[in-house]
Amino acid sequence: MTTSVCLLGASGSVGESTLKVLRAHPEKFRLHSFSVHSNLEKAKEIQKEFSPDFICVSSDFADVGVLGNKLGRTQILYGESSLCELVREPEVEIVITAIVGSVGLRPTIAAITAGKRLGIANKETLVTSGPLIQSLIAKHNTKVVPVDSEHNALFQLLESLNPNSVEKIILTASGGAFRDLPVEQLSSVTKEQALHHPTWNMGPKITIDSNGMINKGLEVIEAHFLFNVPYDKIGVVIHPQSIAHGIVELKDGASFLYASYPDMIFPIAHSLFHPEPVPKVLRSYPAKDWGKLEFREPDFKRYPGLGLAFEAGKVGGTAPCIFNAANEAAVELFLKDEIRFIEIPDYIRETLDEIKIEFPLSLEEYEEADRIARETVRNLKARKVVSAC
């Protein structure tokens, strides 16, 4: 009996790695449905190979004529609202949320309330509305297994340890493409340089986030909500080799770390198979081949966005939501060559300073905070353009 999987964000790097796992285990999993934003050619390729029941094209500007309303046996749905329809399908058992950005929030909530098992790779969901998501997970008794490599590593470690023995959890980070660049040279970083990452092959937005360690800041906030750990018990270390993905420090002074070859198939396979063990070797990487492992504290002058994430997380309420939305809006400006790489955290800081922090009870209130933050970034940019004239 195969398990039916709904994959949101099939054309991205996490989506492609998920398809690798499904491809390797056809006896265990069936791709019931998937979504793409606008990559229609990729959708055709996946449909031809897996023949799912449904495809959702979430972009409002997609050319409906390319796929039509049906492709073979596969029904084609359009628009962001259809993402929620996909995850609510009765046959779906596991939902993998690999969509980047706050657009993943509503379908994630739909999966939780529909009682699906959730493999969560969309960190923005917990960052933007963590308290709300936590309450829904508890209310619906939803099984959530994180798909991010660091959170999945910590999930596996914490699952095997006595909670009373844990002192601190540590997220590892490669440090990105600019970890050894003199700080004074960060002001001249180009878009082409910022779109390169030394370890992971990812989409443009998450690559830029990673190179400024803002991505790690988002992961800190996500870890707080996933594991119910206070911020002063969450640490970050730079680990250039990207072999250790998570570390748990114990109260007796000992530590456990989770290590594997840096490949997303490990956390994805674990998320899909959990609580069963993954039945075969994904990629052997014995300790004798690791070489030297380095760990060092991050420099907050080099990575101001990481410090801002800790601050926003500790403030709580809508502060993490504003942090995330301001970052998304600032990265968009950077990708359009309208601001410099080092200005991204400046826009986040100024947006957090301008907006009053609220403590919402509803999804709509979080979404309003998100909207206001994006609008504030655009207004800040417009004011700076005027003042420069």
Curated annotation (Swiss-Prot):
Binding site for 1-deoxy-D-xylulose 5-phosphate: K123, S149, E150, S174, H197, S210, N215, K216, E219
The encoding gene: dxr
InterPro entries assigned to the protein according to its UniProt record, in alphabetical order: DXP_reductoisomerase, DXP_reductoisomerase_C, DXP_reductoisomerase_N, DXPR_C, DXPR_C_sf, NAD(P)-bd_dom_sf
HAMAP family: DXP_reductoisom
Listed name of the protein: 1-deoxy-D-xylulose 5-phosphate reductoisomerase
EC number, UniProt record: 1.1.1.267
Cofactor dependency: Mg(2+); Mn(2+)
Reaction(s) catalysed by this chain's protein: 2-C-methyl-D-erythritol 4-phosphate + NADP(+) = 1-deoxy-D-xylulose 5-phosphate + NADPH + H(+)
Pfam families, per the entry: DXP_redisom_C (PF08436), DXP_reductoisom (PF02670), DXPR_C (PF13288)
